[in-house]
Structure formats: structure tokens, C-alpha cells
Amino acid sequence: MYILIISVIVLFLAYLRYFPLDYDEKKHFEEIDNQRKSDFYSVDFGKKYFNLWKKDKRNVFHSIKWFLEKKPEYNYEKGKYFPENKNIAKEELRNLTESKKDFIIWIGHNTTLIKTGEHFFLCDPVFSEKIFFTKRHTKTGIDPVILNEVFKDSKLNILITHNHYDHLDMKSLKRLKITGSIYLPAGVKKLLKGINAAEIKELGWWEHVESGSLKINFLPAQHYSHRISQSKNSSLWGSYVIETENG
């Protein structure tokens, strides 16, 4: 019996070793050109979402192979192209928010703080040192305690792009005193148990919300969604475009 189990494992690993993962750019764009135009009309088929441009053909074998493969190591040469990520003190952040200049501050990983006019947005807030057993490779540029103090009397809105753990971290959201609204993709709101905000608004592709002089648009992105508590592509993913009175 043990020999049979070991044999199955060896055969499975051998299969993964030679499982094709090569990317063919020419074939990729040929498939996009041949995509049926009717596929662009809707993104929700039978409670599952799909990419508009090209359906995802990856499966569990791709994920296992990627997990088992040796990853390229981070080195100094790559580090030279890495954006600067420094710790921002409370007074420095307060001065930035009170200035008339708009800004985008990279806080680390996928988290950014955006100021446009008198409006503030925190995109995909992640402050945890580990996300789903994976240690982060960038330090956190702003302590959430500082964010809570600086935005105590003003609205800080939250933008969530999709449900992956390194973009939607419940521990990080619970550390924030959210004074504004939360905008997120369709199907993700159910995950936000115990999160308080002035408004929690789900959006589908091409939908928008108007807030004062702002128009917050939720647009398509080539990606996917998956979480232990949500099956693959059962919730949406996307990108944001914030329109101001100046364009």
C-alpha cells in the first residue's frame, strides 16, 4: 500500500515537472483577436466572473507547479529599481494632507494613499507583516495608528480592488477607524464582517459612484479572485479611475 502511495506521488510530481507553463505571446494575442465580441457584453455567467479579453485557462496544477518551483531570488540589481518606501511620521503626514497639493504615497506592497482636492483614498490597505503565511517584502510606510489620528476629523475612503489576501487583509481593515466609505467589487462585501464605515458600496465593471465633485469609476482588469471562503471568480475584481472637477 505504501509503495502504491509513494508511486502515485512520484508520478504526480513528475507530471508537474513537465506540465507546460510556457508563455507564447503570439498565441496569446491571436486568441484575444479571435475572442467572440459577445463575450464582452457581460462578465457574470452563472454566478462566475470572467476576464473580458481572454478566459483564464489555468487550473490547480498550474498553482501547485508554481508553488513547488524555485523562485528567482531578490538581488541588489533589482533593488535599484525599487521605489523608495520610507516611514512617514504623524506631523509629516498631517502637513501633507493640509497642503493644497495632490499626491499619491506608496505605503508598501499594493497599498497607496491618494489625495485629490479635499478627498482622501486608501487603496488595498495591508499593514500585516505576514499575509496567509507569506512574509511581506516591503516595510509599512505609515502606521495605521497615525492614519487614525490624522484622519480623525476628516473622511478617509477605502478602495478594494479584489479579494486576494494581500489586497484585502481583514486584520489591517480592523486596525483602521474608517471615517469615510468603502468601495469594493461585487461579491466582496459579505467578507467585511465587523467592519464599520459610513457606507460600504459594491461596484460592477463600468459602474460609478458620485461623491461631491468626484466620480469614482470601477473598471475592468485582467485578473481573477479566489479566497478560502469564496470559490474562484465568484466575486469580481477591477481597477479604479477617480475623476475630479479638473478631469
Residue positions per predicted region:
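Active-site metal-binding motif and surrounding structural segment of the metallo-beta-lactamase
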Residues: K37, K55, K135-L184, A198-E199
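Binuclear metal-ion centers of metallo-dependent hydrolases, dominated by the metallo-beta-lactamase
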Residues: Y2, L13, N196-G212
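Metallo-beta-lactamase
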Residues: M1-E149, E243-G247
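Structural motif
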Residues: H119-F121, N157, S181, L214, ...
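Active-site environment of divalent metal-dependent phosphoester hydrolases
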Residues: H164-L168, K189-L191, E207-E210, Y224-H226
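Short amphipathic alpha-helix with an adjacent loop that forms part of the alpha/beta core around
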Residues: V145-S154, V209-G212, S229-S231
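Catalytic core of the metallo-beta-lactamase
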Residues: N110-K115, E210-G247
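Short, polar loop motifs at secondary-structure junctions
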Residues: G108, P185-L191, G204-W206
